[in-house]
UniProtKB/Swiss-Prot annotation:
It comes from Struthio camelus (Common ostrich). GO terms for molecular function: neuropeptide hormone activity; neuropeptide Y receptor binding. This is Pancreatic polypeptide. The modification Tyrosine amide is found at Y36. Hormone secreted by pancreatic cells that acts as a regulator of pancreatic and gastrointestinal functions. Belongs to the NPY family. The keyword tRNA processing does not apply. GO terms for cellular component: extracellular space. PROSITE patterns: PANCREATIC_HORMONE_1, PANCREATIC_HORMONE_2. It is found in: Secreted. It holds the Pfam family Hormone_3. Keywords: Amidation, Hormone, Secreted.
């Protein structure tokens, strides 16, 4: 399966945080889709 995105850190730029949460949402969608 896909690799889980790594949290960029609290001091990361906002763009990195936004990208992380976007990737995390896609990751969770893929993971939950394959689980059922």
């Amino acid at each position: 399966g896909p690799a889980q995105p790594t949290y960029p850190g609290d001091d990361a730029p906002v763009e990195d945080l936004v990208r992380f949460y976007d990737n995390l949402q896609q990751y969770l969608n893929v993971v939950t889709r394959h689980r059922y």
